[in-house]
């Protein structure tokens, strides 16, 4: 058996003291006594996660038995410069005079973010179905207002791509698996202040991912 993990800094293991040993991808792989590879990168968007994952799957000589896909904060985006260089934007890194600030202030709204996330979920699901690739997935977010009420941001009926994903039942990391940082501070690297999942949080994530894989 082989596993492929993809996502943002959560799957990468940010804020862990012993990242390679404590992150959930390692724990899950040890459970199945199998090899794995982790494609995750810090600060990337759902566009980047899906594109990077598909590119890697296309270039592998042997497909993994299961892909574990972690979708991320929906306001993150990527764009290409005139020189075909990929740039990633995150709301947290927007400077006072950055051009990306103009995008988030004048153009971006929650519907755009939701639509982009669901578009990527639809795209990856379609790719896996077309290529007989098994996968499990979950959605993670850093923003407390979304963590507490994800249905307000993710389960609305506005937009087109969400409706195309009517058969997709999302698993929310913080809401369904870890609890909020106020409810379960031990699951977070910064306790009640939140942050990335702690070592205990990654163990909890591993338990949930194992349940999803076993249910395939």
Indicate where each model-derived feature is located.
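Serine-esterase "nucleophile elbow" of acetyl-processing enzymes
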Residues: 1-48, 52, 204
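Alpha-helical cap/lid subdomain in secreted, periplasmic
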Residues: 54-216
């Amino acid at each position: 058996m082989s596993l492929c993990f993809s996502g943002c800094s959560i799957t990468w293991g940010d804020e862990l003291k012993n990242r390679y040993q404590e992150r959930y991808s390692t724990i899950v792989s040890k459970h199945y006594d199998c090899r794995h590879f982790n494609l995750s990168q810090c600060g990337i968007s759902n566009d980047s996660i899906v594109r990077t994952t598909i590119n890697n799957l296309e270039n592998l000589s042997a497909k993994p038995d299961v892909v574990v896909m972690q979708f991320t904060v929906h306001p993150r985006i990527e764009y290409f410069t005139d020189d075909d260089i990929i740039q990633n934007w995150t709301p947290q890194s927007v400077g006072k005079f950055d051009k990306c600030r103009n995008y988030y202030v004048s153009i971006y709204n929650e519907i755009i973010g939701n639509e982009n996330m669901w578009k990527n979920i639809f795209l990856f699901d379609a790719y896996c179905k077309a290529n007989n690739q098994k996968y499990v997935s979950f959605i993670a977010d850093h923003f407390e207002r979304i963590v507490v009420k994800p249905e307000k941001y993710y389960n609305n009926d506005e937009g087109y791509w969400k409706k195309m994903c009517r058969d997709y039942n999302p698993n929310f990391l913080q809401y369904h698996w870890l609890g909020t940082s106020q409810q379960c501070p031990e699951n977070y690297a910064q306790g009640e202040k939140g942050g990335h999942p702690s070592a205990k949080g990654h163990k909890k994530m591993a338990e949930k991912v194992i349940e999803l894989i076993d249910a395939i």
